[in-house]
Regions:
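Transmembrane alpha-helix termini and helix-breaking/packing motifs in multi-pass membrane transporters
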Residues: 22, 134-157, 251-253, 370-393
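Helix-loop junctions on the cytosolic side of multi-pass membrane transporters
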Residues: 109, 157-187, 200, 406-414
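Cytoplasmic helix-loop-helix junction between adjacent transmembrane helices
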Residues: 88-131
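Hydrophobic core of transmembrane alpha-helices in multi-pass small-molecule transporters
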Residues: 5, 71, 82-98, 234, ...
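Juxtamembrane intracellular "pre-TM" segments in multi-pass secondary transporters
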Residues: 171-231
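Helix-breaking motifs and short loop linkers at transmembrane-helix boundaries and internal kinks
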Residues: 24, 56, 77-82, 306-310
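C-terminal transmembrane bundle of multi-pass solute transporters/carriers
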Residues: 31-33, 42-50, 57-61, 253-414
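A single, central transmembrane helix in multi-pass transporters
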Residues: 13, 19, 218-273
Length: 414
C-alpha cells in the first residue's frame, strides 16, 4: 500500500491540466499531449507485461519510478509543449512497466501465502490508499502553488517520485503462481522455441520473453472468460480517461483557480469510496454491476450538464458546480469500484503462467479506449463546450453497462 500511495502523492496531479493551459496550450494541444501519453503506454503495454513475466518484477517497478521522476523533472525544468510531450513519454513508459506488474506481484505474493482469495480486498485497500494519497496531494497543491508557483509544485513532485522509487526496492518477491500442468505446458512450448538454437544461438532470456508473450496473449484471446474479462476491465478503466478534463470543466464553469482542486477532489473522494467498498462488492453478479454502472452513467451525464449550467451565472456558479461535481464523484466511484471487481475476476479467470502479460493486454486495450477519448475530446471541443463533451462521455457509460452482464467473469468458488 505504501508503494502505491507514495506514487500518487504527487501535487502535480491536481494541477497539470492547468499547468499546460497556463503555458499557452489549447484544449486540442492538451488532448494531443494526453494522446502522446496514452500512445506510449499503448506501444509498450504488452511487451512490458511479458518482460514482467520474465525478469524481476520488483526491478521493473523501481525502473518505473526512475522514469516517473525524470518525467516530472523535465516538466518543471522545460515547461513547453516539447517538454510536456517528452515528460509524457517518460511517464507513459513508467506506467507501462508498472501496469500489470504490481498486480501480478501482489497476486503471486498472496498465492504464496495461500491467501489468493484476499486479492480483491487487498487490491481495493491498496487502491484506496492511493486515492487517499491523491486527496492529500490535491490539498497540498494549493498552498504549494500559492507559496512557490508551479516550480515548487513541480520540484516537490520530483522529490516524492524519488521516494516512490526507493520504496519499490523494498517490495517483497514471490514465486510466480503457476500450477504443475502449466509448468509442463510452458516447458513444452519453450522446448519448441529453443530447439532451433542448435543452428542459430539465441539468448535464453529473449526466448523466455517470447514464450511468455505468446502464452499471455494466446490466453487472452483463446479463453472466453479471460477474453471477456480483459475487454470489460479495459472498457471500465479506459473510459475513465475523462478525468483528465475535470479541471478544465471546473475552469470553464467560472470558479476561481483556488477552488478547482477542491472540485476535482470531490471526484477523487468518489473513486476513494469505490476502492474501499471493493471488498464488499466483489461477489456482485453481472446483472447487479450492470444496474450500478448504468446508474453511474446517468449521474455522470447529469453532473456534467449541471456543471455546464454554471457558466455565465456568477450568482449560482459554486452551487451548480458543487452539485455537478458531487454527482460526477458518485458516478466515478461506482465505475471505479466496478473496474476493481472486474479486474479481480479477471485475475481469478487467468490460469496460465503469463499473468502480467494477460493483465497488460487489458491495459493495452484500455489505452486504446483512452486514445479514442482524447481524440473525441479534441474534435468535440472545436465546436462544443467541455460540459457537452463530458456529458457525451457519460452517455457512453450506459453502453458499457449493457455489456456487463455477459462479459463479467464469474466469481471464483470460495
Amino acid at each position: 500500500m505504501l508503494f502505491k500511495s507514495i506514487g500518487e502523492l504527487i501535487p502535480l496531479y491536481a494541477l497539470y491540466a492547468l499547468l499546460f493551459a497556463d503555458h499557452g496550450m489549447s484544449t486540442g494541444q492538451i488532448s494531443l499531449l494526453f494522446a502522446i501519453w496514452s500512445a506510449t503506454s499503448f506501444l509498450l503495454e504488452v511487451p512490458s507485461g511479458a518482460w514482467a513475466d520474465t525478469v524481476s518484477r520488483r526491478g521493473l517497478l523501481a525502473l518505473s519510478g526512475v522514469l516517473l521522476t525524470a518525467g516530472f523533472a523535465l516538466w518543471t525544468a522545460v515547461p513547453s509543449f516539447a517538454g510536456f510531450a517528452a515528460g509524457f513519454v517518460l511517464w507513459g513508459t513508467s506506467g507501462s512497466l508498472a501496469s500489470g506488474t504490481f498486480e501480478a506481484l501482489l497476486y503471486d505474493d498472496l498465492a504464496a501465502r495461500g491467501e489468493s482469495g484476499s486479492y480483491p480486498r487487498v487490491l481495493g485497500y491498496t487502491r484506496a490508499g492511493a486515492e487517499a494519497a491523491v486527496v492529500v496531494a490535491i490539498v497540498a497543491a494549493t498552498p504549494l502553488y500559492l507559496y512557490g508557483g508551479y516550480a515548487l509544485v513541480g520540484w516537490s513532485s520530483v522529490v516524492i517520485a524519488g521516494a516512490h522509487t526507493l520504496v519499490a526496492l523494498s517490495l517483497p518477491t514471490a514465486p510466480k503462481a503457476v500450477s504443475a500442468v502449466d509448468v509442463d505446458d510452458l516447458e513444452d512450448s519453450a522446448s519448441e522455441a529453443i530447439a532451433p538454437e542448435s543452428v542459430v544461438a539465441r539468448p535464453r532470456p529473449f526466448a523466455r520473453y517470447l514464450t511468455m508473450l505468446k502464452t499471455g496473449v494466446g490466453e487472452a484471446i483463446r479463453v472466453r472468460a479471460v477474453r471477456y474479462g480483459v475487454l470489460l476491465e479495459a472498457l471500465l478503466f479506459g473510459i475513465t480517461a475523462f478525468d483528465e478534463y475535470f479541471a478544465l470543466l471546473a475552469e470553464e464553469s467560472g470558479v476561481s483557480t483556488a477552488v478547482v482542486p477542491l472540485l476535482v477532489g470531490l471526484t477523487v473522494l468518489g473513486s476513494l469510496t469505490g476502492s474501499v467498498l471493493a471488498g464488499r462488492t466483489e461477489g456482485m453478479s453481472g446483472r447487479t454491476m450492470a444496474i450500478a454502472v448504468g446508474g453511474a452513467g446517468v449521474l455522470f451525464l447529469g453532473g456534467a450538464v449541471i456543471a455546464g449550467l454554471a457558466t455565465g451565472r456568477p450568482d449560482a456558479v459554486y452551487l451548480l458546480t458543487g452539485v455537478g461535481f458531487g454527482s460526477i464523484g458518485v458516478s466515478y466511484g461506482i465505475v471505479y469500484n466496478a473496474g476493481i471487481v472486474a479486474g479481480a475476476r479477471l485475475q481469478d479467470a487467468i490460469e496460465g503462467p503469463a499473468r502480467a502479460t494477460v493483465t497488460s493486454v487489458s491495459g493495452l486495450l484500455g489505452e486504446v479506449i483512452a486514445l479514442a477519448v482524447f481524440g473525441f475530446a479534441a474534435l468535440v471541443t472545436l465546436w462544443w463546450s467541455m460540459s457537452t463533451l463530458l456529458a457525451l462521455l457519460g452517455a457512453s457509460i450506459l453502453a458499457i453497462a449493457a455489456l456487463t452482464p455477459r462479459w463479467l467473469p464469474r466469481s471464483a468458488e470460495p
